[in-house]
Curated annotation (Swiss-Prot):
Site (Inserts into a conserved IL7R hydrophobic pocket, important for IL7R-binding): 37
Subcellular localization: Secreted
General function of this protein: Cytokine that induces the release of T-cell-attracting chemokines from monocytes and, in particular, enhances the maturation of CD11c(+) dendritic cells. Can induce allergic inflammation by directly activating mast cells.
GO cellular component, one term: extracellular space
Disulfide bonding pattern of the chain: 25-98, 57-63, 78-121
Subunit-structure text: Interacts with a receptor composed of CRLF2 and IL7R. Binding of TSLP to CRLF2/TSLPR is a mechanistic prerequisite for recruitment of IL7R to the high-affinity ternary complex.
Ubl conjugation recorded as keyword: no
Gene behind this protein: Tslp
PANTHER family the record matches: THYMIC STROMAL LYMPHOPOIETIN (PTHR38003:SF1)
Keyword Secreted recorded: yes
Protein name: Thymic stromal lymphopoietin
Amino acid sequence: MVLLRSLFILQVLVRMGLTYNFSNCNFTSITKIYCNIIFHDLTGDLKGAKFEQIEDCESKPACLLKIEYYTLNPIPGCPSLPDKTFARRTREALNDHCPGYPETERNDGTQEMAQEVQNICLNQTSQILRLWYSFMQSPE
């Protein structure tokens, strides 16, 4: 039992240490892609739904770190979020405009129920939209 707990803690620490530093990204290109493409995908998925969960970030690299995490990692009740069009386009933008961006292995969500809980997905999508807004307002 102690060994399993130690392995779990080690896994968490390794994942935390393997996060990408988004400071070398081409923010101008990513901003254009967001404004012209990703924004429309996000608002289309939300279909006008609004949620009060608000999380901001202090800089463009910090925003991209949160955007990547919330967009590309499945959450309980919404395992298919990383497969949405806006998520695929976000992944492409990061791959194309962040030198050396290593997409880490993602949890594929197979442990999750097959049926999504619509409200959870909409809430997560709303949070991602807010983070993109914060990205647009943040200094480099």
